UniProtKB/Swiss-Prot annotation:
Function: Plays a role in cuticle biogenesis. In complex with tsp-15 and the dual oxidase bli-3, promotes the generation of reactive oxygen species (ROS) and tyrosine cross-linking of collagen, thus stabilizing cuticular extracellular matrix.
Source organism of this protein record: Caenorhabditis elegans
Region (Disordered): 324-376
Organ and tissue specificity: Expressed in the hypodermis, specifically in seam cells, the terminal bulb of the pharynx, the distal region of the gonadal arm, vulva, spermatheca and uterus.
Membrane-related topology note: Multi-pass membrane protein
Glycosylation sites: N109, N327, N330
Residues passing through the membrane, by range: 26-46, 57-77, 191-211, 218-238, 261-281
Subunit composition and interactions: Interacts with bli-3 and tsp-15. Interacts with csnk-1.
Record protein name field: Dual oxidase maturation factor 1
Polar residues composition bias: residue spans: 341-350
Major site of localization recorded for this protein: membrane
Subcellular location: Membrane
Gene: doxa-1
Amino acid sequence: MWWFGGNPSPSDYPNAAIPNFNMHAFVIFSVFLIPLIAYILILPGVRRKRVVTTVTYVLMLAVGGALIASLIYPCWASGSQMIYTQFRGHSNERILAKIGVEIGLQKVNVTLKFERLLSSNDVLPGSDMTELYYNEGFDISGISSMAEALHHGLENGLPYPMLSVLEYFSLNQDSFDWGRHYRVAGHYTHAAIWFAFACWCLSVVLMLFLPHNAYKSILATGISCLIACLVYLLLSPCELRIAFTGENFERVDLTATFSFCFYLIFAIGILCVLCGLGLGICEHWRIYTLSTFLDASLDEHVGPKWKKLPTGGPALQGVQIGAYGTNTTNSSRDKNDISSDKTAGSSGFQSRTSTCQSSASSASLRSQSSIETVHDEAELERTHVHFLQEPCSSSST
């Protein structure tokens, strides 16, 4: 009678392997990867300045993604070593495993992977460790966080090599203060990276609306990244060595050195400094042009538009200045007429005579301006002929 539990479902399922996948890192990278894919899809529709736009877009996304990755990914210092160790207590089993340490700004990641079994135990048979892989993360942002992590590790029964690493980070006495050095270095480096990210956000906004000022924020981003690397270099321990037993029963040291995130931020800092200086020099000499997001006339070009006046002698310059003065007087007169018309129209008592007078005055101004223009052109031709005749007369004499 299976409905009373006579034929229950099986309860001994095989243990599924946990995928080694960081979901938080995937979400953060998606924030920068999805806009890049969207831009690649619309890239064939970009007609003007395609190369400059693509380089700028990819560079800005790469800098932002690198800054966020360095904040969450524990890879500022790392090290790994093959060790001969005991896996569990009250057992004679000895295994060859690979232990690794990855140190970030606010956490430490310790891994232990089984390689092969060196000596078996007849008392506890049936221990299959071919799929053995530990990956534990511990917080180092607090003063006593590593001591608490060691306490929880002893309660949960972590392997001996991982407990040895936690002991090195939890000690805070005399020269055994590696955990405190990494905590202080991570704290100040974390603040410097967040400041660099704020400068990066400002550079994105300026690149869209005020491109001729974007080089300043890009330069600030690069300097902040270089300061973060310098702070981590000075405050972190010079060399962390954790002693273990090797495969041939010799002493081996697990050494933590600078890793991927440190060199990535250093490269991003140098790149931003070079780009900022290059854009600043080009802005000073008005070499390049960038269109704004809203196509504003003020920031359409890096430098203000200017034209050099033609030089043709003092008489020609005097004619140009005189023509400019007549044009300005005519424009001021037209503005006065328009303002008087608006005042009369707003009062509601605009008479036909005033309209006639205004039309007559505007007609007289147009005729006067045309006469002055013809007179200026004639005078300009006379001066030009005079300049041409002077060399001939001087040569004949």
